[in-house]
């Protein structure tokens, strides 16, 4: 009887995790555009990635956060879909989301990346995958 009860609890807990999207896969985040944490992650990812691109002279910047999905692992994966454009800030300067605005004539690209934040708060950015402008 005790083992049956434990099995029911285990299966019930797994069903809740699967239904809420906590168990394994990515979950889309609602109200992502109103959440400053996601905007800060988007700017962090975009500035970090663009600074590592050979031949670039200017940072890219975030024009829009299109979609945010999260996955809980040993930390959190944030899969970000962004519209990015070349900014007015040169790579020799310090990136600032408030002053590094898109150039007026810059093409906007839709890009996807994953930012992993471990349990200590350290972040890493996967390469961007962008659609042609």
Swiss-Prot record:
It comes from the Eukaryota. It is found in: Secreted. The keyword DNA-binding does not apply. Pfam families: Cystatin. Disruption phenotype: Combined, RNAi-mediated down-regulation of salivary cystatin-L and salivary cystatin-L2 in salivary glands strongly impairs the tick's ability to feed on hosts. About 40% of the ticks cannot feed and die. The remainder show much reduced blood intake, appear unhealthy and display strongly reduced egg laying. RNAi-treated ticks show an impaired ability to suppress the host's immune response to tick salivary proteins. GO terms for molecular function: cysteine-type endopeptidase inhibitor activity. GO terms for cellular component: extracellular region. Residues 30-118 form the Cystatin domain. The keyword Signal applies. Residues 1-19 form the signal peptide. Detected in saliva (at protein level). Detected in salivary gland and midgut. Keywords: Disulfide bond, Protease inhibitor, Secreted, Signal, Thiol protease inhibitor. The record marks 24 as: Reactive site. Disulfide bonds join 89-100, 111-130. InterPro entries: Cystatin_dom, Cystatin_sf, Prot_inh_cystat_CS. Belongs to the cystatin family. Monomer. Can form homodimers in vitro, but probably not in vivo. Homodimers are predicted to be inactive; dimerization disrupts the interaction with target proteases. Contributes to the suppression of the host's immune response to tick salivary proteins and is important for successful feeding on hosts. Inhibitor of cysteine proteinases. Inhibits host papain and cathepsin L (CTSL) (in vitro). Inhibits host cathepsin S (CTSS) (in vitro). Inhibits host CTSV and CTSC, but to a lesser degree (in vitro). Inhibits host immune responses via its inhibition of host cathepsins. Inhibits differentiation of host dendritic cells. Inhibits proliferation of host T-cells in response to antigen stimulus. (Microbial infection) Down-regulates TLR2-mediated host responses to infection by Borrelia burgdorferi and the production of the chemokine CCL3 by host dendritic cells. Down-regulates host responses to infection by B.burgdorferi and the production of IFNB1 by host dendritic cells. Decreases symptoms in mouse model of mannan-induced psoriasis-like inflammation by modulating immune responses. This is Salivary cystatin-L. It comes from Ixodes scapularis.
